């Protein structure tokens, strides 16, 4: 039987199945690298790969070798990142409604925390967390889900805190001895419109300015989480990354992005 099915540089899937047996998952690391470098080259950002997209250790090790950091949302994902060789300082830990046990795991691991609420930050302080570099996730009031009914920003969203709560969180971090500050926003999910990301960048920078003015701190790390999409249906456009070459210029400090499916979805 002949089936014209290949992957990567013409490698036959039939031959791979004959060699390794089935069921078999095959990843094209060349495609992973192309996707990774396209984001880095066009945005000027540091990539923290979102482990929730695919936590395969071989993929994680490969992305680490390219220079990526890791975005983790649970102790399990922190564990995978550490197993793959990521340094704790290159792991961003963002979770909604983290339990004491989940927070304690992150503290012991020494990862960078991105707190979703002032309550979570206060809980961590009570468990012995000592902030040095600390991120807070801010709800910009604007965000797109991958399908109708998925809310990523605004009153009904679980992601992040509104500006007044964020101001109080940064004030508390300053009081507790933090020396570096980051700000994070959930951009959306599977967005294919490049102009949308520029709008989010502007909103994030404006939120940072307000916080800096009110609290008297300097935000030096800007994290745009999620968002970068890939087409799933015939006729859907690809995300035009060339329009994002000015993205880095919106921010006076380090820009971080947290792609997942864009890196591995078509690999």
Q: What are these model-derived regions, one by one?
A:
Residues 60, 142-158, 182-197, 221-239, ...:
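Active-site-proximal beta-alpha loop/turn segments in soluble metabolic enzymes
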Residues 35, 81, 163-178, 204-215, ...:
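Structured alpha-helical segments in the cores of large, soluble enzyme domains
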């Amino acid at each position: 039987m002949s089936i014209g099915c290949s992957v990567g540089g013409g490698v036959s899937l039939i031959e791979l199945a004959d060699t390794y047996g089935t069921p078999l998952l095959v990843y094209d690391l060349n495609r992973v690298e192309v996707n990774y470098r396209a984001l880095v080259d066009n945005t000027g950002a540091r990539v923290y790969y979102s482990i929730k997209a695919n936590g395969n250790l071989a993929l994680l090790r490969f992305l680490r070798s390219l220079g990526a950091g890791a975005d983790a949302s649970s102790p399990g994902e922190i564990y995978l990142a550490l197993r793959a060789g990521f340094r704790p300082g290159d792991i961003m830990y963002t979770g909604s409604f983290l339990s004491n046990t989940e927070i304690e795991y992150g503290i012991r691991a020494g990862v960078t925390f991105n707190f979703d609420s002032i309550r979570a930050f206060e809980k961590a302080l009570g468990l012995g967390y000592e902030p040095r570099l600390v991120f807070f996730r801010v709800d910009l009031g604007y965000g797109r889900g991958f399908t109708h009914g998925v809310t990523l920003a605004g009153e009904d969203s679980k992601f992040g805190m509104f500006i007044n709560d964020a101001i109080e969180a940064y004030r508390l971090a300053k009081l507790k001895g933090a020396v570096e500050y980051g700000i994070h926003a959930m951009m959306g999910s599977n967005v294919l419109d490049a102009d949308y990301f520029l709008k989010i960048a502007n909103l994030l920078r404006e939120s940072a300015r307000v916080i800096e003015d009110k609290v008297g701190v300097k935000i030096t790390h800007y994290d745009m989480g999620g968002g970068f999409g890939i087409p799933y249906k015939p006729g859907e456009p690809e995300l035009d990354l060339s329009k994002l070459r000015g993205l880095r210029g919106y921010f006076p400090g380090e820009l971080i992005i947290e792609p997942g499916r864009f890196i591995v979805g078509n690999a």
